[in-house]
């Protein structure tokens, strides 16, 4: 039986693509990014199956641009015991390893970043076999399969959330997490060195705090500014800014975000930088039920020198 089919030109400028939607043999929606110049090759859609059941909540979702298309990742649960890393938009498909097996996670954390070309990197937590310490896992997603890379150096707490950003001058990634210290701190690790580094001044972070990170990259100076947001033990929105050069981050003083409403204790947090002038943060304020936007205008005071604490 022939499949239903429809096509649109990708609205992303200069993508040179048609977005071809059709049904798989399992009667699920598929999407192929076909070049407008038909002589060029393309990656055929591979159906790993839809995870029956729900997108896990509480958990995290993450969005990133890949091949001129916004892709959303999530954690799905087909039954009562296992949960899997999946693409949940623009199609719904399990991510598989090189042996065509779905990729499991036992935790709620998920983050993603992009090189704004063909590569996405997705991060999650798992227990390596035979250990009791959670590790950060990385998937480099270019097509429908990926072999997980384990960051064995960092020691994230099991209830940590994650944030991830891409540093284009070095083609490097930086991942933020909370550690297993008795007093929680935020840590960073990059994909080259893969060792955990404590962020001074973040000792007030709430256990299992939501995390959001935005960036501004300066190609001329080969540097990047990270704006990291989190919840403190008083449920206030905090900000700390880091300057990336090579494989290192110089962190400035953390600050409570002036004027930001207190956060609902179980809210998650996301943000985007706008015109390199302000960060737009979305979270649920205390006493509310809806995600609200708060604009944090970028100021010179963000770059006060760091202090221990």
Curated annotation (Swiss-Prot):
Intracellular or extracellular location(s): Secreted, Cell wall; Membrane
Effect in UniProt of substituting residue 222 to S: In strain: IFM 45817, IFM 50993, IFM 54196 and RMSCC 1036 / AZ1
GO terms, molecular function: serine-type peptidase activity
Keyword Protease: yes
Membrane protein topology class: Peripheral membrane protein
EC numbers, comma separated: 3.4.21.-
Biological process, per Gene Ontology: proteolysis
Key words of the record: Cell wall, Glycoprotein, Hydrolase, Membrane, Protease, Secreted, Serine protease, Signal
List of glycosylated residues: 190, 295
Top-rank EC class of the record's enzyme: hydrolase
Consequence when changing residue 247 to D: In strain: IFM 45812, IFM 4935, IFM 51112 and RMSCC 2128 / TX1
Entry keyword Nucleus: no
Record GO cellular component, one term: extracellular region
Free-text function comment from the UniProt entry: May participate in wall plasticization and/or intussusception or in cell wall turnover.
Name of this protein: Wall-associated proteinase
